[in-house]
């Protein structure tokens, strides 16, 4: 329906309601249906609220709905429909639009709707309309619960909502232009409520225990009734002017008179007897112009005091996001009869309704029966009525419901939550700041009421006050609250009134706390601090054990005897041990030193058989370089090698031992359970006051002091008292030595009405005198005026610069002697080029005289000029670039000359080189030495494909892609992928499966040994299920892995299991909105099945069963023919087990090969193959190739 048709239908519908003639409204026969049509139109209006605007422009509420409401009340269906339509029409504009629109066009519609709402409010300001509503509400409340229907409850709620909506409409200040003691539209509305008796019904709903379901509606209406009022003014209505009020008014008039007299004197000085056409020009000595000369002044001398270099300059525009928050609350004094009515309403409300209503509202809030942010009305009512009770006849029993520790805790929790939300929800920061202000006012009134109870003549009231104060001052949260509020104060969101209330509340709290401490003598308070676990100090030295060389020599005979027994009786030797950690992030090639450390630990612990088993296992894993002995080593040589390992200082990583893993887990659990450590200590008021000696807090006080003319006398007193506590009480006058504050003092002292601010003037003179006394001793104090200072700078200004360093001399590191520097230089030059070790750790292992830290050694190396920067010694993750020594270059040249005619030059060099480097580093060095001219010369040479070999039974052996030697395809790889081994871990999961297949199988085997077989089966089934779904649906999307059992959930939290997931290409949760690990969309169904197959324990066991018997130890590995025969035997065995003929297998292989896309990328892991080949070569087992390479299928876009 377009806009034109909507206008026509709205016009027809409004005309069908009826007409007003001579004060009597004549309704049409289909009036009820027309009202329902209007409700339906409002339900379907657009975002500009066009229907609402057209009805407001037609004044449908003033001309039709109000007359129907007042004259046709007996027609109940029509009356209910009109009430329902009026509730919709008077809905606040903020609820209609969600918030104040920022777009200019939408803001125009917002302001238009607001204008119509203000017209509705003016139309309702009549006794007749509220009289009908009051009578209807009275009749409905007379019905008992057994007679009241659901329609009656709906009508009660709608009437309360209608009253709420009318009172919620803000006043149009520009249109009304009302002053104090003048009747505004809001005052007329309140008077109509009073005359109609609606206020009595609100009091009844507040006090009745049977009508508690309307408590939040009633509280919201009452808060809107007193929106522009102040409790102190209402409490003093009709009691005459008090002496204190008269003295305050006289002081304000005296200030105005003094300023007016000063202005008259200034104007008199400016009036000259002669004209100023021949006044002349003057030079202002000491005031420089743009150049080096003095300023030339062309005006009269009487204008000299108003001279400024900023005259004529364009004022600097403050960005909108940095502008100070504006005051939104407007306080005005209503007409006398309205104030008298409101005062009587407050008194009766406190007498009969406050405690039951606040109890019911608190119950709704705690049971979450209220709407969002309804607690703000609760805190407003608490602040307003407790202040009214204090200003009138103070009776603590009238507000006993909200005078408890639970209320303090509730307000403090909301206040903390509001400022935390203000920091996180930046878009709604202004709204959170307003709620924060309401909570602060409630907290202020709670403290003021408790303070007033101290002066009550009743002993029971004073005892209650003492108990409350004892609990408040004991808890740390209440003491830290004001410090946190000052730190989080932001002028962009908090108006000046918030800062004023915060300063006054802090003043009251400190005054109560100081008085309480003096009366008690000593006060025990609660102290909370976060318990931080100190990391275990691990020795940075190379030797982790404290045995001297002599002790090690004495230990060796016993170890040698155990080793001889193991050699004579093989049954005494232990089973082989895995010498490396397969789940570690450190590559296996780099774990050789750690394996040697484990051997040394076994020897020092007296476990010679375990050390021997580790040595033999490490020899199989790392045969290169004969670091753990040659493959044909004799038992005697093994003993000598173990003796060398025992006496050699080895570098150790700063990690806890395996035996302490359980203790660490227990400590982590204790740390989670005991995050905060609670203790008690004796309270020191001065120590607490020192927490306020901060530049952030002082700047907030100075900001409020700038408006000292607009501040009340009490506010200025609170500012002066706090600054005096910091300056005189703590002896930190230098904290206030700031140029902007001195400019403010200058303006204060030159104010004509300075006599009215005696306290501020006295304090300003005191601070300025202290500054000049310090400046006579410390000339740098003038420069310090430009900066805000903390307590450390204040101490240096007053006690001398460098006093902080002298105070902490006991914590300084000892000086380096010339002998230590010479030893440091010698050690650094000797070990800086040694690969595979940290030069700083090696130096620390040899520095025995004075214990040094790593940081001290590094900084002294830089200071001595041996190193250029500290960054040279930073521990980098991954493989570090190690310089090639001359011997290593010669070895590389020898190996190249030896294997230059072989099919795989680079592979042979990688197998036989002593110092292990990545393929990319070896290739780069070969190019740098000029041994090869281009990388292509190092590619593995492809052999000519021969006719397919026949099996023993005469059948052809199919050659699947997974059976091919991955090294043959090495030349098809990109250079970066085939050579840079370091980047394999950083590849995506789809590109790194080939290199991670073997490590995934090893991880799966270790996880099965730990008892995680069931989670592995669940993971495998999830991968297969995802592969089936992707084949059926044809589309791929990330699939979460949701553990449904407790065992699977614990496995997902296991670090080793997570490492396996990463190896398989499953990605962890990427953001705060994701909880589960996900199978990426880029993995195809074929890849998922291959990954699942790598987890199959049965397949691994079958492969191990089919492996031939080990051969003679010491052989370097099977030949190419032996390897081919082993592969064929393995394939035929698999066929016999699966019952699959060779023809079917060949067809299946051909289908898989032909169905592959055009773009194929083959990834392999030469390093892992070489390692496995060496391991099997040492043990004499023929190497059987498993699936080491996968086809990564890339879809063409």
Swiss-Prot record:
In this UniProt entry, the residues modified to Phosphoserine are: 281, 1071, 1084, 1165
Q: Where is the composition biased (Acidic residues)?
A: 656-673, 963-985, 1099-1109, 1143-1153
Query: What InterPro entries does UniProt report for this protein, alphabetically?
Result: Timeless, TIMELESS_C, Timeless_N
Which of the residues bear the PTM Phosphothreonine?
A: 1086
List compositional bias (Low complexity) regions by residue number. 986-999
Query: Which segments carry the region annotation Disordered?
Result: 647-674, 943-1002, 1088-1197
Region: Interaction with PARP1, residue numbers:
997-1095
Instruction: State the conditions that upregulate or repress this gene.
Output: In retina, expression exhibits a circadian rhythm in the presence of light/dark cycles. In the suprachiasmatic nucleus (SCN), isoform 1 exhibited 24 hours oscillation, isoform 4 is constitutively expressed. Shows a circadian expression pattern in the intestine with peaks at ZT4 and ZT8.
Provide the free-text tissue specificity comment from this protein's UniProt record.
Predominantly and robustly expressed in proliferative organs (spleen, thymus, intestine and testis) compared to those more differentiated such as kidney and liver (at protein level). Expressed in all tissues examined including brain, heart, lung, liver, skeletal muscle, kidney, placenta, pancreas, spleen, thymus and testis.
Report the subcellular localization.
Nucleus; Chromosome
Q: What is known of its domains?
A: Residues 1172-1189 comprise a putative nuclear localization signal; nuclear localization is required for the regulation of period length of the circadian clock. The DNA-binding domain (residues 810-949) binds to both single-stranded DNA (ssDNA) and double-stranded DNA (dsDNA), and has high affinity for DNA sequences rich in guanine that form G-quadruplex (G4) structures.
| Similarity-based family | Belongs to the timeless family.
Summary of subunit composition and partner proteins: Monomer. Homodimer or homomultimer. Component of the circadian core oscillator, which includes the CRY proteins, CLOCK or NPAS2, ARTNL/BMAL1 or ARTNL2/BMAL2, CSKN1D and/or CSNK1E, TIMELESS, and the PER proteins. Interacts directly with PER2; the interaction with PER2 is via its second PAS domain. Interacts directly with PER1 and PER3. Interacts with CRY1. Interacts with CRY2. Interacts with CHEK1, ATR and ATRIP. Interacts with CLSPN. Interacts (via N-terminus) with TIPIN. The TIMELESS-TIPIN heterodimer binds preferably to guanine-rich quadruplex-forming (G4) DNA structures.
Matching entries from PANTHER family are given as:
PROTEIN TIMELESS HOMOLOG, TIMEOUT/TIMELESS-2
The identity of this protein, by name, is Protein timeless homolog
In its UniProt entry, the species of origin is given as Mus musculus
Phylogenetic classification of the source organism: Eukaryota, Metazoa, Chordata, Craniata, Vertebrata
């Amino acid at each position: 329906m377009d806009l034109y048709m909507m206008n026509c239908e709205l016009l027809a519908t409004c005309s069908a309601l009826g007409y007003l003639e001579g004060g009597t409204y004549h309704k049409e026969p289909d009036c009820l249906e027309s009202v329902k049509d209007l409700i339906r139109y409002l339900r379907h209006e657009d975002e500009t609220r066009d229907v609402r605007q057209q009805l407001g422009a037609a004044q449908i509420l003033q001309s039709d709905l109000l007359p129907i409401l007042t004259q046709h009340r007996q027609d109940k269906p029509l009356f209910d429909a009109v009430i329902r339509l009026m509730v919709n029409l008077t809905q606040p504009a903020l609820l209609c639009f969600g918030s104040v629109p920022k777009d200019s066009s939408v803001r125009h519609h917002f302001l238009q709707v607001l204008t119509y709402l203000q017209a509705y409010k003016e139309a309702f300001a009549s006794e007749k309309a509220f009289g009908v509503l009051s009578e209807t509400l009275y009749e409905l409340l007379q019905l008992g619960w057994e007679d009241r229907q659901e329609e009656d409850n709906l009508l009660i709620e709608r009437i309360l909502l209608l009253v709420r909506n009318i009172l919620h409409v803000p006043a149009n200040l520009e249109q009304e232009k009302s002053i104090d003691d003048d009747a505004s539209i809001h005052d007329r509305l309140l008077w109509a409520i009073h005359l109609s008796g609606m206020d009595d019904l609100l009091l009844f709903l507040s006090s009745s225990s049977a009508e508690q379901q309307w408590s939040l509606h009633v509280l919201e209406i009452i808060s809107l009734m007193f929106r522009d009022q102040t409790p102190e003014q209402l409490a003093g209505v009709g009691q005459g002017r008090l002496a204190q009020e008269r003295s305050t008014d006289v002081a304000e008039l005296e200030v105005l008179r003094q300023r007016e007299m000063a202005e008259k004197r200034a104007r008199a000085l400016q009036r000259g007897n002669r004209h100023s056409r021949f006044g002349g020009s003057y030079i202002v000595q000491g005031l420089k112009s743009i150049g080096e000369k003095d300023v030339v002044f062309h005006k009269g001398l009487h204008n000299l005091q108003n001279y400024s270099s900023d005259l004529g300059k364009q004022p600097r525009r403050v960005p909108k996001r940095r502008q100070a928050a504006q005051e939104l609350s407007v306080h005005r004094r209503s007409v006398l009869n309205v104030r008298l009515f409101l005062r009587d309403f407050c008194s009766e409300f406190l007498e009969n309704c406050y405690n039951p209503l606040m109890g019911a509202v608190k119950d709704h809030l705690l049971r979450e029966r209220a709407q969002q942010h309804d607690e703000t009305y609760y805190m407003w009512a608490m602040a307003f009525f407790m202040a009214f009770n204090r200003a009138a006849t103070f009776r603590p029993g009238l507000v006993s419901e909200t005078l408890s520790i639970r209320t303090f805790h509730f307000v403090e929790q909301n206040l903390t939550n509001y400022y935390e939300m203000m920091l996180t929800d930046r878009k709604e920061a202004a709204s959170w700041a307003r709620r924060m202000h309401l909570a602060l006012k409630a907290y202020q009134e709670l403290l003021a009421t408790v303070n007033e109870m101290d002066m009550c003549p009743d002993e029971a009231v004073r005892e209650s006050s003492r108990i409350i104060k004892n609990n408040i001052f004991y808890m740390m949260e209440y003491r830290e609250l004001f410090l946190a509020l000052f730190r989080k104060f932001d002028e962009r969101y908090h108006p000046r009134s918030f800062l004023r209330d915060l300063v006054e509340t802090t003043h009251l709290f400190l005054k109560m706390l100081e008085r309480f401490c003096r009366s008690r003598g000593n006060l025990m308070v609660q102290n909370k601090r976060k318990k931080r676990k100190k990391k275990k100090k691990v020795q940075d030295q190379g030797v982790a054990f404290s045995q001297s060389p002599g002790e090690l020599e004495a230990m060796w005979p016993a170890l040698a005897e155990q080793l001889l027994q193991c050699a004579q009786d093989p049954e005494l030797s232990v089973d082989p041990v895995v010498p490396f950690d397969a789940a570690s992030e450190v590559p296996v090639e780099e774990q050789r030193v750690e394996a040697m450390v484990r051997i040394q630990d076994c020897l020092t612990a007296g476990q010679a058989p375990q050390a021997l088993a580790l040595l033999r296992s490490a020899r199989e894993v790392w045969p290169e370089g004969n670091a753990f002995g040659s493959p044909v080593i004799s038992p005697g040589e093994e003993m000598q090698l173990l003796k060398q390992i025992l006496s050699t200082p080895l570098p150790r990583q700063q990690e806890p031992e395996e035996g302490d893993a359980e203790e660490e887990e227990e400590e982590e659990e204790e740390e989670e359970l005991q995050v905060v450590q609670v203790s008690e200590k004796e309270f020191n008021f001065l120590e607490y006051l020192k927490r306020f000696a901060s530049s952030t807090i002082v700047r907030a006080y100075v900001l409020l002091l700038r408006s000292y003319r607009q501040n009340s006398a009490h506010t200025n007193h609170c500012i002066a008292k706090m600054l005096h506590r910091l300056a005189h009480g703590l002896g930190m006058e230098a904290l206030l030595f700031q140029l902007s504050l001195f400019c403010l003092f200058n303006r204060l002292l030159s104010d004509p009405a300075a006599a009215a601010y005696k306290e501020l003037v006295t304090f300003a003179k005191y601070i300025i005198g202290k500054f000049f006394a310090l400046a006579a001793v410390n000339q740098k104090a003038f420069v310090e005026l430009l900066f805000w200072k903390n307590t450390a700078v204040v101490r240096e200004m007053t006690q001398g610069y460098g006093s902080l360093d002298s105070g902490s001399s006991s914590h300084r590191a000892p000086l380096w002697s010339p002998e230590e520097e010479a030893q440091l230089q010698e050690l650094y030059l000797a070990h800086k080029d040694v690969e595979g070790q940290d030069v700083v750790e090696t130096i620390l292992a040899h520095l025995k005289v004075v214990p040094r830290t790593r940081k001290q050694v590094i900084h002294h190396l830089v200071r001595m000029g041996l190193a250029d920067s500290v960054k040279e010694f930073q521990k980098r993750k991954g493989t570090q670039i190690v310089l090639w020594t001359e011997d290593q270059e010669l070895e590389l040249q020898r190996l190249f000359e030896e294997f230059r005619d072989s099919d795989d030059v680079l592979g042979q060099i990688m197998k036989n080189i002593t110092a292990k480097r990545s393929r990319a580093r070896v290739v780069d060095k070969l190019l740098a030495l000029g041994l090869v001219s281009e990388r292509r010369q190092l590619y593995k040479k492809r052999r000519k494909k021969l006719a397919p070999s026949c099996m023993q039974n005469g059948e052809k052996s199919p050659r699947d892609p997974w059976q091919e030697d991955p090294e043959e395809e090495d030349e098809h790889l990109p250079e970066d992928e085939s050579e840079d081994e370091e980047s394999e871990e950083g590849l995506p999961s789809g590109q790194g499966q080939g290199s991670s297949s073997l490590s995934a199988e090893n991880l799966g085997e270790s996880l099965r040994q730990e008892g995680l077989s069931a989670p592995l089966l669940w993971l495998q089934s999830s991968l297969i299920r995802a592969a089936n779904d992707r084949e059926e649906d044809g589309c791929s999307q990330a699939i979460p892995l949701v553990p449904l059992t407790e065992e699977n959930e614990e496995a997902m939290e296991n670090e080793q299991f997570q490492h396996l997931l990463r190896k398989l290409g499953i990605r962890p949760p990427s953001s705060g909105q994701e909880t589960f690990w996900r199978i990426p969309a880029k993995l195809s169904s074929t890849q998922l099945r291959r990954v699942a197959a790598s987890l199959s324990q049965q397949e691994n066991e079958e492969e191990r069963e089919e492996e031939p018997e080990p051969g003679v130890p010491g052989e370097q590995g099977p030949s190419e023919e032996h390897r081919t025969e082993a592969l064929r035997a393995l394939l035929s065995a698999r066929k016999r087990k699966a019952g699959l003929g060779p023809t079917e297998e060949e067809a299946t292989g051909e289908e898989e090969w032909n169905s592959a896309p055009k773009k194929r990328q083959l990834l392999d892991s030469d390093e892992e193959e070489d390692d496995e080949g060496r391991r099997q070569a040492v043990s004499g087992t023929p190497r059987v190739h498993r699936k080491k390479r996968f086809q990564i299928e890339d879809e063409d876009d």
